[in-house]
């Protein structure tokens, strides 16, 4: 029986050595036949050492005792996944006693509980300068195969964005599969969607069995989020795409000839970290070139961050990993996915808007945003708070808070917060309201989100909302009219979205995060036929394309652009691609003014490196950046050494023992060869000078003499040595040092920002500088 269990769990041939962690799993899996265990169970991510021999497995197996196999208190551990590519280890549901046994077994490194991560929930390609048949989108630059793996809610394979017309056969290097499942056949894949897998064991261990009346236990997308991100990154060109006539035009992914591999690890209530790791692990094994992750959790140390650890494994295999920054802005230090080997993407505006004019009874006009395209509403009475419902939640229009006798036929005012935006509209409609005015709070500022509401609705910024509420407070019979203007172009853009999470990074403050901004507000892309555009079950509408917002939408823009760069520069490392995207980013808008920040105090405030990183992505310039900052696995490991990580914690990333260099004690985390600079100064401390070293690689003109230009952060003197970098050949590497001298301490915590640029002919290699006083 011993041998049967061993072969059933871990089959192997005589000429294939077993990994040590597999022997470790067999050992703890079977050793519990000999002991009683406590009944409380929880799912864990477990990291183990990566050494292996079949002899160890056999010797452990032969040492087992099973005399208590029939004990009534016996509880079998549940092993969900074995991780071999993204990390070394496995996930399992264990009792407390079983976890203790695992911790005391040779080869164990660490364990932490599974958790649910959150999703960070088209014309944008044209706004970024990508047009069919021109420049980067001509046939020459699109000739090679690049595979984008998206970890999300799945995909809708029949969607028009995923046609494989004129695509070449699937690359022979592809090792993935198209897994069967509920309402998903292997025949659903084609030359565009070349891989499909679903991961739900971790989710079900936390939440319970998936409700297959509302979701599919397969890669099929029941929510729409995964279809939206996949079509944004790599969707085919679709003419006349629109949302009920709005935003009509050409829809396309950033790299429309790329292949797609869909890994469904996100379900109705979120994404279990164990499932996300399993999806990344499979993507690495399958052979993707880019991994796109529009999801994340709260910021935490990298050694307990599943995306940071699994993303490191992908980076080691030369895979570019793009992650959303999160939707917790504009509060500072909310950015997630901040590991330096990940590309962290903030959300920005395009110049496309959906204006609606609200004219209130005192003849003032307020400008909002709406996807409704019906007839105007004229002189309807307004209802708000106590004039709309008797419950305290009426101010937010939460479920069952409004009274029909108070709101029927009226325009209802709802404040943002406490419930979903489209759910507020559902409550207004349920209560007989004619329309909704959704007012931003001070925290949300002037953000104008165009949501797919179930009734006529207008989003208003904080200032106009305040004007509206002041009018309402002083009017006996307040009324309003609304005129819907459809789709408009030419608004000031780009601009950082207020909801986009901000730096500095809590886990790694010496690395400026986020890295880059990309379109993430009111983005049109493909949608699932099994989900309403509002995500409300009461909404019977079905659409081919939907308009939604979030850093979730920004992330696949960068994933697709990274694939585009990879198709032109197949030998570039993930760090080189990241550097090219960052150092060529735009910092001015379409009015030639500094890119603004919707979440900052003051309507004209310029965005900083903690809002948009290096700037807004410019794909055309990114393909020819001149210089790049390359970073190796060893560089990243030395960075972890500089964080004073123990050898055990570094082992989580390296997979094998890594000895920190003797000079690591004098290295700063800021010495990582990164395309931006984060300088941290402590008020009142003796440390007034910080010095960083950088090395750049010439990927532009073989001979070029770069001159440095510095715009100093307020309160800091910046010195660069040398001031000139003379390159004589392609791929030559030259180094420089930057010294930051604080002029004086600050009285409180604050930040100031500057820029360092290397200039030669057409090249402007720009790196942002962020200085923080603590």
Curated annotation (Swiss-Prot):
Source organism of the structure: Arabidopsis thaliana
PANTHER family attached to this UniProt entry: PROPROTEIN CONVERTASE SUBTILISIN/KEXIN
List of glycosylated residues: 36, 138, 183, 211, 385, 477, 644, 657, 747
Effect of residue 552 to A: Loss of protease activity
Protein name according to UniProt: Subtilisin-like protease SBT1.1
Keywords: Extracellular matrix, Glycoprotein, Hydrolase, Protease, Secreted, Serine protease, Signal
Domain of life of the source: Eukaryota
Function as written in the Swiss-Prot or TrEMBL entry: Serine protease that cleaves the phytosulfokines PSK3, PSK2 and PSK5 in vitro. Phytosulfokines are plant growth factors or peptide hormones that promotes plant cell differentiation, organogenesis and somatic embryogenesis as well as cell proliferation.
Cellular location(s): Secreted, Extracellular space, Extracellular matrix
MF terms in GO: serine-type endopeptidase activity
Pfam family, one: fn3_6
Transmembrane segments: none
Similarity comment text for this entry: Belongs to the peptidase S8 family.
Signal recorded as keyword: yes
Span of the signal peptide: 1-39
Upper classification of the organism: Eukaryota, Viridiplantae, Streptophyta, Embryophyta, Tracheophyta
Every PA domain range: 379-472
EC number: 3.4.21.-
